From Swiss-Prot:
Source taxonomy: Eukaryota, Fungi, Dikarya, Ascomycota, Pezizomycotina
A GO BP entry: mitochondrial translation
Described purpose of this protein according to its UniProt entry: Allows the formation of correctly charged Gln-tRNA(Gln) through the transamidation of misacylated Glu-tRNA(Gln) in the mitochondria. The reaction takes place in the presence of glutamine and ATP through an activated gamma-phospho-Glu-tRNA(Gln).
Entry keyword annotation includes Nucleotide-binding: yes
UniProt-annotated catalytic positions: 62 (charge relay system), 141 (charge relay system), 165 (acyl-ester intermediate)
Domain of life: Eukaryota
UniProt subcellular location: Mitochondrion
Protein name: Glutamyl-tRNA(Gln) amidotransferase subunit A, mitochondrial
Gene3D superfamilies reported for this sequence: Amidase signature (AS) domain
The protein's enzyme class: ligase
UniProt record similarity statement: Belongs to the amidase family. GatA subfamily.
Catalytic activity: L-glutamyl-tRNA(Gln) + L-glutamine + ATP + H2O = L-glutaminyl-tRNA(Gln) + L-glutamate + ADP + phosphate + H(+)
Main location: mitochondrion
Keywords: ATP-binding, Ligase, Mitochondrion, Nucleotide-binding, Protein biosynthesis
Amino acid sequence: MSLLLEAERYVANQSSNRMLNAFITPLCRHSGRWHDQAKDADIRGKQGKLRSRLDGRFIAFKDNICTRDFPTTCASKSLDTFTSPFNATVVQQLEDAGAIVAGKTNLDEFGMGSHSIYSSFGHVMNTRRGDDSKFLSAGGSSGGNAVAVATDQCYAALGTDTGGSIRLPAAYTGTVGFKPSYGLLSRWGVIAYANSLDTVGILAKRVSVARDVFDVLNKHDPRDPTSISPSSRSRISSKLNLPQLTSRLTSRPLRIGIPLEYNISELAPSVRQAWCHSLEYLRQQGHTIQPVSLPMTKLALSAYYVLAPAEASSNLAKYDGVRYGTRSDDSTENQSETYLYAKTRGAGFGPEVKRRIMLGAFSLSAQAIDNYFIQAQRIRRLVRHDFDAAFQAEHPLAAEIRNVELRQQAKQTGIDVLISPTAPTPPPTISDITDTSTKRSNLDAYINDVFTVPASLAGLPAISVPVSGKDNAGNQEGDILAGIQVIGQYGDDELVLKVGELLERR
């Protein structure tokens, strides 16, 4: 199929799938240059002069990534009139590679949510394994991205992953979701939720497509202070022996770790079945399976929901309606500036954002910071230590372990990657999530991140790949798709992608 015909198909699918609400600003409603861009890419292809493997491909962007030609709203009333004067670095990199912006996708407001229902533009709907009367959760916060990819409204999509916001939607929609190591991809032009956790991630239908996007974006950006420098990238490559990755995979079987703490009682039978099938398949391929203990996992989720809201409460203080965004028009002669500020923020932010701002402000308060924020930072360091102790490869940017005996033991018994479920259950229905009679709905949504948060706290690369399983009714394999997560040592992104491809071939 020519790139132009492919582009026309994506635009048609955006129009026919409007009810899914995957896009806030779809290309079909935005007069752009996509037709000419796709035609030009076709010409370059016939001449053998494609700019990259993504030339002429439709890439959708989560609506918290700044684009010059499309509004950037973060799915919030506070930014519903905002258009950035510049492109984010990742947008510019993809446009330079010939990719076409396919539109801006829906999300939980400012990236805060697990089901893509906290958007001022309405819920994102997922129809996988459901009929139109029972829409399923698309996961969050990058649910619009995942649904757009799953329903062929774009070739791939770029979003953000703070505690699982790429991987959870991938698991719920049967797509591939890749979160690279923290700092490899530029965050310049990405509207922040939690700076120390936010990572630009990729959603696609195949691991190979996610790799193509990653290869274009995996570059140092001097404008982003969290971007890994060229010297550090060289150190990562040298320490992890990345140039010899193929020989690493063929010289010996992989040692694959099963995190014991991820085998929880709440794990759905279909998810457990998919996990077991994946491990058995890898064992049949000659790889070694061994249990691994990550004792701080049980505290990771609590630490995350202290740290992320704390950073968010600081980041979102800038939205006052003065410099940009929506400003409250409720004005009287006697009102103070403080009243206007409070009124603007009260009207502009949704309930989940307000909840997390309050949580974050409390954990940073003088009476709570020692017992909450400081303790959460300590737990975060211990979570990373758990991973470092489990992996055979030493963290390439961390201080070297001085205990030679411990390092030798890790080299002999350490694992190459961890494999776990991405989410403990299949996607719930939208009606179940929004049922006001269910008092635990907010807490349940937080618990959905239990398997994805640890890798985020440690800044590790992780990918979610769809794998077949069975449900409670005994439906045949293939009826249920569960997300299986592969986690690697920091900087070992290529190995994570390779193992993801192994699972994809299953």
